[in-house]
Amino acid sequence: HVFDVVKGLFANAYREDVHMALEATFAKGCPGDTDADSFMEVDDEKVNEKNIRDKKFDVVSKISFYPMGEEDYMEHIAKVVMTAKERGVFARSSHYVSILEGDVHNVFDVLEEIFKYGEENLSHYILQVTISVNSPTKE
């Protein structure tokens, strides 16, 4: 539900012609980082989706995916890039980042898919994300 909440916040904060950016770090499996861990019984319903699905606007995002402690880390990074390409939001590579562009829903869906990939295939990973809308400068 983390991505439903973050997407809900971003979509509801959006204003036409107003520049806005989000910087976020999503991680799982960090050794020793369990103090705030908790399990809440929840269902699979994305509670914000029904309220934001009609909000349409394009975003630019730069992402970095870090599979920690993996000798074959480049294979995991390549899988993440391929996922973005297959979903039609991969724009280009830059220095240590991939640039994603597209509708806010499509970009957030890919971010969630990348996170799920990490959850299913890695014990420790970090997804660093910047999302921008209405930037006055070329991203």
Report each predicted region and the residues it spans.
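Charge-rich, low-complexity N-terminal segments
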Residues: 1-139
